[in-house]
Structures are given as C-alpha cells and as structure tokens.
C-alpha cells in the first residue's frame, strides 16, 4: 500500500477508534473510493457489521458508539430522548421492564437504514421529530453547552469512559414521554416518573412548555406535577404557554383534573411503588 493510502488508512482508523462507525456516504465524502474501502476490508483493517457501514476490525459494537457516530460523525441531529434518556439519567427503575433496553431517538430526519440492521443488544426506535418546534442543532464537538441547553439538550456520558452523547434533559424528556402516552399503562409509568422529578428547573420547564406543540403533553405534564405537589411548579413561568381550550379525555372513565382539564386514571395512587 502506498504512503498516501497508508496515511489515509491511519486517519480513518483514528476516526473510528474502538467504538465508532462510518457509513459509505461518509467515506465517499472524505474521498475513500469503493475499491480502497474493499481493500481495507480484504486486508483485515475494516469490517462491515451491516451493509453500508464500517468499523475497525476488533472494535466494539456498542449503542453509545453507534449514536455518537450518527450525531458527530454523520452530522445527524438525532438525540437520545424520552424514556431512554430518563433511564440514562438514573430513573430506569421507574420504567416498564420491557422498554429499558430500547434506545429512543428523536430528530427531524429518519436515521439511515443500516442502523436497525446492526446486531446490537439494544433495540433502536426512531420516534420522529417529537413535540417541539425548536430548530435542529448540529451536534459537532464545537457546539456550546448554551446552544444545547436552549433546546433542552445536553452532552451526557452513559458510563465512565463512554462516548458523550446529546440527550434530552429531564425537562424535555418528560414532555417527550408525555407526548407518546396513548393508554392507561403509560399514564401509570409517566406518573411514577413524575413523582421522582423533584429537582426540575422551573425556567427550563417554562422554556420547554413554550416550545412544545402538543397540548396533551403539556396538560399531562402539568397535571401530574401538580398531583405530586412539586415545589418547582409554582415557579414555572407560564407566559406564552398555550394549553389550548376545552377538556381533553386522555383515558376513558378517568377523573378530570380541575386546573388542567385532562382526564387521569382514578387509581394512580394504587400503581405507585
């Protein structure tokens, strides 16, 4: 292999490290021809865990490295949100057992097809743009904490030494989860989580409420926060928060919350641990 190609290989291996992946698209953009990539594979430098994506031979295929590759390497504004983000931040014992291992992604664009074909221990679920009208942010290493914070996002390490990922803060993740509530069992889950949300930041909650387009999500979030009498709720700035009009029937035969006009299951207390 010539000096130029050896240099290109070294750059690629440095980019990949032990846990990253690169797509065929990324390789084309960075001037790695199909024939050169095929040579790297046949020489034992690269492997393809799914069609259209490559990693270092002997590397570790882990969900953290995959998401980091999407966010920073591929430049896709997909963040870890909702249920899985809350689990990462210490609330996994409140989540339904079968959902703890599902990585929930949000963003304006669907992830590449190879993502669901990777042999990961976790399932990855794309839940669309989510309930917010916020503009997408580019998740480069140069993006500031303030830019992310204005979106209800933050860099988060899933474990010591793991890749840092862009995840929803608890304020945003709770509204994302409330938006996806479609049955009584999910209300029980969100209620248990809300009970634990004793340290949410009122200004951040207000910001997320103002940018949330889902009337259901906002009313459910506020009704459950009120039900658990969280001290921060009275400090949330409600100027510019649209809660819609009329009553919302979230569950059949439920009790109407007097302030936020949304029906909640009447047996919520019985389902709290």
Over which residues does each language-model region extend?
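Short beta-edge/loop segments at beta->alpha junctions of small alpha/beta modules
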Residues: 1-84, 98-110, 114, 196-225, ...
């Amino acid at each position: 292999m010539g000096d130029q190609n050896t240099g290109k290989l070294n750059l690629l291996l440095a980019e990949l490290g032990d846990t990253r992946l690169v797509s065929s698209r990324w390789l084309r953009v960075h001037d790695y021809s199909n024939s050169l990539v095929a040579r790297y594979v046949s020489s034992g430098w690269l492997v393809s865990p799914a069609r259209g994506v490559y990693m270092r031979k002997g590397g570790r295929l882990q969900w953290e490295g995959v998401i980091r590759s999407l966010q920073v390497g591929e430049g896709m504004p997909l963040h870890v949100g909702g249920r899985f983000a809350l689990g990462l931040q210490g609330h996994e014992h409140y989540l339904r057992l079968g959902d703890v291992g599902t990585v929930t992604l949000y963003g304006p664009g669907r992830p590449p097809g190879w993502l669901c074909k990777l042999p990961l221990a976790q399932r990855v679920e794309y839940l669309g743009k989510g309930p917010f009208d916020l503009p997408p942010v580019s998740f480069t290493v140069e993006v500031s904490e303030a830019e992310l914070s204005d979106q209800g996002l933050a860099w988060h390490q899933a474990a010591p030494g793991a890749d840092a990922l862009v995840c929803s803060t608890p304020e945003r993740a709770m509204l994302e989860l409330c938006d996806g509530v479609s049955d009584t069992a999910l209300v029980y889950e969100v209620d248990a989580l809300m009970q634990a949300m004793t340290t949410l930041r009122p200004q951040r909650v207000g910001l997320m409420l103002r940018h949330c387009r889902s009337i259901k999500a906002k009313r459910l979030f506020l009704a459950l926060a009120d039900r658990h009498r969280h001290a921060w709720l009275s400090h949330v700035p409600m100027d510019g928060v649209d809660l819609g009009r009329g009553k919302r029937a979230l569950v059949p035969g439920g009790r109407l919350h007097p302030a936020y006009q949304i029906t909640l299951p009447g047996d919520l207390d019985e389902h709290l641990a």
